[in-house]
Design a protein with these regions (language model features):
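Active-site catalytic motif of lipid deacylating hydrolases and related acyltransferases
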Residues: 4-6, 11-72, 167-168
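Gly/Ala-rich beta-loop-alpha elbow adjacent to hydrolase catalytic centers
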Residues: 75-86
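Short beta-strand/loop motif that positions the catalytic acidic residue
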Residues: 130-132, 136-139
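Conserved alpha/beta-hydrolase "acid-adjacent" motif
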Residues: 27, 114, 143-150
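Active-site nucleophile loop of the alpha/beta-hydrolase fold
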Residues: 22, 47-50, 103-112
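The conserved beta1-alpha1 loop
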Residues: 18-22, 78, 139
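Conserved hydrolase catalytic core segment
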Residues: 87-102, 111
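C-terminal catalytic histidine-bearing segment of alpha/beta-hydrolase fold enzymes
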Residues: 160-172
């Protein structure tokens, strides 16, 4: 008779998509609004303080939201919220893939460049360590704050897959 290992019949918990907008909820991109409207597995995290964002407050709100969710989390962020995720990873140093199992980061702003609005520049110098989960970074060539080459460098540093919907390689 062979030894058998009991198999759990417990169904793994479905992940929650935590949408972390980088600006006022009223100004959310259409894709975010559509996801929130059509998907039952999405929840929006309002970081607040839009007129004067505060990095550590945003990181704390993000961490508290992740801690209260009792299932795997996929973070979806755009703009300045992408940097809040990078700072969360830097400060909290979570174990790889737990509880955040993935991230989609869209149009991270280049906050390390000189002459930037001081409210946004407070999120620099951007952490450059690999993120604690698989991630995708999508630049926005139409966003004046998202420098394409900087976004490519962040993807490399964060160990995120760089996905440009318009090209397969970054511009020279």
């Amino acid at each position: 008779m062979t030894d058998r290992v009991p198999v759990s019949c417990e169904t793994p918990k479905e992940p929650l998509i935590l949408i972390v907008p980088g600006h006022h909820a009223d100004d959310a991109p259409r894709w975010q609004q559509a996801w929130e409207r059509k998907r039952t597995d999405c929840e929006r995290l309002d970081l607040g303080m839009w007129d004067n964002p505060h990095r550590n407050t945003w990181v704390t709100k993000l961490n508290l939201a992740i801690d209260r969710i009792e299932r795997p989390v996929v973070l979806v962020a755009d703009g300045l919220a992408t940097l809040a995720i990078a700072w969360w990873a830097e400060y909290e140093r979570p174990a790889f893939g737990h509880p955040v199992i993935g991230a989609l980061l869209i149009a991270p702003p280049d906050v390390d460049r000189p002459g930037l609005d001081s409210r946004v520049a407070k999120f620099g110098a951007v952490p450059r360590r690999p993120l604690p989960c698989p991630a995708f970074l999508v630049p926005d060539r139409t966003d004046p704050l998202c420098n394409y080459r900087t976004a490519y460098g962040l993807a490399r540093d964060w160990d995120a897959r760089f996905i440009d919907p318009e090209a397969s390689e970054p511009d020279a």
